[in-house]
A protein has these predicted regions:
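Basic, alpha-helical nucleic-acid-binding regions used in initiation and control of genome expression
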Residues: 1-6, 14-18, 22-24, 29-86
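Helix-loop elements that line ligand-binding/catalytic pockets
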Residues: 9
Length: 86
């Protein structure tokens, strides 16, 4: 997780780093729980709402960090946690 955030220019010294890291980890775990209830749905469809929530977290920090590409971040994280996203 740390390497993804740093690759986006979000460093531990930023106020809110821990909050964003926690929010993303929590949403990724929630996606896994959702997938258990809806096993026929691809992760890419289930994570739409999760993407929106995480984007809101980044928007709150947009004045201190560069605007990241949330789709690529989530795709990488989901693939790391669960394998192929489709």
């Amino acid at each position: 997780m740390h390497k993804y955030l740093v690759s986006l220019g979000i460093y531990p010294e930023y106020k809110g780093y821990r909050y964003i890291k926690y929010a993303i980890e929590h949403r990724i775990k929630s996606l896994g729980k959702l997938h258990k209830h809806f096993p026929n749905e691809p992760y890419s469809r289930l994570d739409r709402n999760i993407r929106y929530v995480i984007q809101q977290q980044y928007d709150k920090m947009s004045h201190i960090v560069p605007r990241p590409t949330i789709s690529s971040l989530l795709s990488n994280l989901i693939e790391d946690y669960y394998g192929n996203t489709e």
